[in-house]
Amino acid sequence: MNLRPLHDRVIVKRLDQETKTASGLIIPEAAAEKPDQGEVLAIGNGKILDDGKVRPLDVKVGDRVLFGKYAGQSVKVDGNEVLVMREEDIMAIVQK
């Protein structure tokens, strides 16, 4: 994938959601909510501040992140669906 996001934008691939509950019930794909976790695939150069300086992003490529249900814009690239969002749409980085 050859995408380079601009400024404070981030490219995120949604992580697959569990299709089975803890009690063993299988959740049909139509009823499953979209996952709110993903892996950062690419990041922009940073946020341009009012004084013209660039603040580097806190997230890095490979980070696992949490984001809101309606965060980002979904796009297809090379047959894969990814999200393009601003860093401020990311709520947390999942620590390993």
Curated annotation (Swiss-Prot):
GO CC aspect terms: cytoplasm
Assigned protein family: Belongs to the GroES chaperonin family.
Localisation per UniProt entry: Cytoplasm
Matches recorded under PROSITE patterns: CHAPERONINS_CPN10 (PS00681)
Top-rank lineage group of the source organism: Bacteria
Cross-referenced NCBIfam families: PRK00364.1-2, PRK00364.1-5, PRK00364.2-2, PRK00364.2-4, PRK00364.2-5
Keywords: Chaperone, Cytoplasm
GO MF, one annotated term: metal ion binding
Subunit relationships: Heptamer of 7 subunits arranged in a ring. Interacts with the chaperonin GroEL.
Entry function: Together with the chaperonin GroEL, plays an essential role in assisting protein folding. The GroEL-GroES system forms a nano-cage that allows encapsulation of the non-native substrate proteins and provides a physical environment optimized to promote and accelerate protein folding. GroES binds to the apical surface of the GroEL ring, thereby capping the opening of the GroEL channel.
UniProt xrefs under InterPro entries: Chaperonin_GroES, Chaperonin_GroES_sf, Chaprnonin_Cpn10_CS, GroES-like_sf
Record-level GO BP terms: chaperone cofactor-dependent protein refolding
Gene name linked to the record: groES
Official protein name in the record: Co-chaperonin GroES
